[in-house]
Amino acid sequence: MFTLKKSLLLLFFLGTISLSLCEEERNADEEEKRDVEVEKRFLGALFKVASKVLPSVFCAITKKC
């Protein structure tokens, strides 16, 4: 009987550890997704600014306006 309790306790402990590791991995994946979304938003804003500034810079450099 003691051996059965011991093995069940061991299984419960290992299952708990496994579950906590899965949750940590899931949280790490969610953080990476948020980082990618922020990068996409930053690049979009950068392209908008560049599209407004580059023509005037090109005009000033080549002096063909």
Curated annotation (Swiss-Prot):
Disulfide bonds join C59-C65. Its main location: secreted. Residues 23-39 form a propeptide. Expressed by the skin glands. The keyword Secreted applies. It is found in: Secreted. Pfam families: Antimicrobial_1, FSAP_sig_propep. GO terms for biological process: defense response to bacterium. GO terms for cellular component: extracellular region. Belongs to the frog skin active peptide (FSAP) family. Brevinin subfamily. Has a non-hemolytic activity. Has a broad spectrum of activity against both Gram-positive and Gram-negative bacteria, fungi and protozoa. Monomer. This is Gaegurin-5. It comes from Glandirana rugosa (Japanese wrinkled frog). The gene is GGN5.
